[in-house]
């Protein structure tokens, strides 16, 4: 029975919902049955206690396969879940420091950046200035270039060191 509240076009084309004058049928073992009417194909599928599923609507004639639809649907959902799991959106992680940073603090920032890059995230390295420190922008640029050099095996520079207001920043992206 077809539910009248749900539009028919949203439902998958299986069994009686396949409305074409003739279709190419592939058996459950992968062999071609040939070009036959949907009624004949449906009777073949019912003999094997399987479903007739439309695989390619655009082909001439449309291609249908005799298979267990429940199992097929489960496999498709499983593939979609796996693809979603593997998909990682690259966030931008920020590493902040001052141009007068101590050596051990600098190493901590470099290690943070390495961790971010290894997890596939982009890194925004920022040097902030206070008061008259802005006169030493060249030291901040040297610091950012040193950081880029220390991270060159993991990252490539997306945006070179650039001053914006009271900050100087540089963007690094992980190497593929």
From Swiss-Prot:
Tell me the compartments it is located in: Cytoplasm
Query: Pfam families from the xrefs?
Result: IF3_C, IF3_N
Q: Which GO terms describe its cellular component?
A: cytosol; membrane
Q: Does the keyword Protein biosynthesis apply?
A: yes
The UniProt entry, under InterPro entries, shows: T_IF-3_C_sf, T_IF-3_N_sf, Translation_initiation_fac3_CS, Translation_initiation_fac_3, Translation_initiation_fac_3_C, Translation_initiation_fac_3_N
Q: What is its main location?
A: cytoplasm
Xref: PROSITE patterns: IF3
According to the lineage, what is the superkingdom?
Answer: Bacteria
Alphabetically ordered keywords of this record: Cytoplasm, Initiation factor, Protein biosynthesis
Keyword Cytoplasm found: yes
The family note in this entry says: Belongs to the IF-3 family.
Name of this protein: Translation initiation factor IF-3
What organism is the protein native to? Rippkaea orientalis (strain PCC 8801 / RF-1) (Cyanothece sp. (strain PCC 8801))
Q: Which gene encodes it?
A: infC
């Amino acid at each position: 029975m077809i539910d009248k509240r749900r539009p028919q076009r949203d439902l998958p084309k299986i069994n009686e919902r396949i409305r074409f004058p003739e279709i190419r049928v592939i058996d459950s073992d992968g062999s071609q049955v040939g070009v036959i009417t949907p009624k004949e194909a449906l009777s073949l599928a019912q003999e094997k206690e399987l479903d007739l599923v439309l695989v390619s609507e655009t082909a001439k004639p449309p291609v249908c396969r005799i298979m267990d639809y429940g199992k097929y649907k489960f496999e498709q959902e499983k593939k979609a879940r796996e693809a979603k799991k593997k998909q990682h959106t690259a966030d931008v992680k920020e590493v902040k420091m001052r141009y007068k940073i101590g050596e051990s603090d600098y190493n901590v920032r470099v290690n943070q950046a390495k961790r971010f890059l290894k997890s596939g995230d982009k890194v925004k390295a920022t040097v902030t200035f206070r008061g008259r420190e802005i006169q030493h922008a060249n030291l901040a640029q040297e610091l950012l270039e040193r950081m880029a050099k220390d991270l060159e095996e993991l990252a490539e520079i997306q945006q070179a060191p650039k001053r914006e207001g009271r900050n100087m920043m540089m963007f690094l992206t992980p190497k593929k």
